[in-house]
Amino acid sequence: MKQHISDKQLSKFFKENKLAGAIHYHTTFNRRTRYITINNNCHSTILFIHGAPASLMESKEYFTDPELRQTFNMIAVDRPGYGRSGYGDPEPSIKKQADIVKGIIDECRIHRPFIIYAASYGASIACRLLMDFPLTADGLVLVAPSLCPGEEKYLWITPLVEHSFIRKIILPHHRTSNTEKFNHKDELSKMLPWWKNIRVPVMYIQGEKDKMIYTTNAGFARENLVNVPSLEINFIKGQKHVIDKKENPFIIKKILELLKQAGQLTKTTTTSNL
């Protein structure tokens, strides 16, 4: 499915899959960001934040999964510069992207426990969100996450593309991902003092042969997520950065395990506040 799927195509996808989906637009920093909600009449919520280059449709198999549909109301966002959120117009600031996502969450009716599922560069944004707003969610699923400054593959052509005529002729989603790649090390460095602010259970999942986001990010997570109640790290044998769809049952299992942990913590917190 193409990167910048239209609202009409998205509505068709909802209808074909019998999803109670709705399309919304949120404006922050003079940026218009598209997101969707899927109401499954459930008592918990999951938000999907995609990687780069991608769009909210990166998670379409999860939208239609029977087990997840029975468990979660769903939210998914086209990150700035992707899909119908200013296609090709990037936002290099991880903090600003996190603020945009927070604004979307505030517009939605969130049933808790609330889980955030984030992949690749989307994971950086999810972590920044919970650094700045620690009470926003109850658990994090990080898939092939970019967390540590510099611990990812950088291409020699990235700065050339960023500062030459090539930028004007590449596809819009590659223009956005190139800008994010060019700025990512500096943006992650700005987050270094704040990892202690994350206080929710974390499920880390990555292909053991990932050559795009290095597996050393797992060690960084162990060293820096010092205040999370739990951190489970899973490497999937034989998988690279983009994890094959055949592994979706394993990932869904891990999402549901995290939900159980988050639910227990939410119940404990509620009881302690009575």
Question: Where in this protein do the model-derived segments appear?
Answer:
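Conserved alpha/beta-hydrolase "acid-adjacent" motif
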Residues: 211-217, 244
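Alpha/beta-hydrolase fold catalytic core
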Residues: 1-46, 71-72, 260-274
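Active-site nucleophile elbow and catalytic-triad environment of alpha/beta-hydrolase enzymes
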Residues: 178-194
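Conserved HGGG/HGGXW glycine-rich cap/lid loop of the alpha/beta-hydrolase fold
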Residues: 38-84
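Catalytic histidine-centered segment of alpha/beta-hydrolase-like enzymes
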Residues: 239-249
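Flexible "cap/lid" loop of the alpha/beta hydrolase fold
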Residues: 124-127, 131, 140-166
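Short beta-strand/loop motif that positions the catalytic acidic residue
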Residues: 198, 204-206, 210
